[in-house]
Amino acid sequence: MVTLATIFQQYGPAYREQGGNTLLPSHLRVMWCIEHCRTAALGGHRYQCDTCGEVVYSYHSCRNRHCNQCQLDKAEEWLAQQEAMLLPVPYFLVTFTLPQEMRTVAYANQQVVYNLLFRCAAEARQALAADPRFVGGQGGAIGVLHTWKRDLGYHPHVHFLVPGGGLDFVNERWLPARNHFFVRVEPLSKLFRARCAMG
């Protein structure tokens, strides 16, 4: 079975050589952890049967949050926690992508730019949700940062799972989104780009 670890083990050296000093230390660390998860490189325990003498090795896990081999249970637990918070309303997937012009700066300043991406996306989404032409209330969201496309090209974007409506705190009521969509993409895109440009 092909796993991320086997891909990294097979193609990682060439990738690291090609990337040279443009690869971030954090990415190199993740690759190293995944490549060596549950291998002798991380140490382990040796168990031996008292009856037949059979020896079995149990190697340590890397415990890196990006490792799908040893952290799958935690990922599934997180997903179950998020599902438990869902309201009995329709939901929308809203995606915000960092403008192409900002990606070189983003790659060199990831923490600052990713925080900016989340903040600008959340503010734009909330501003339009509060607009009575769309929802007219305060909405919620669960956001997840993705930094790569399927072909592993650098492509920072945030996915928000957004309930189809919002709370009107003045009248203490739920306001459902209209016309089977959350907000219109054109004004949302413009507002998001303007907020990104302002920083």
PLM ranges: what are they?
Residues M1-G199:
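Beta->alpha loop/short-helix hinge microenvironment recognizer with preference
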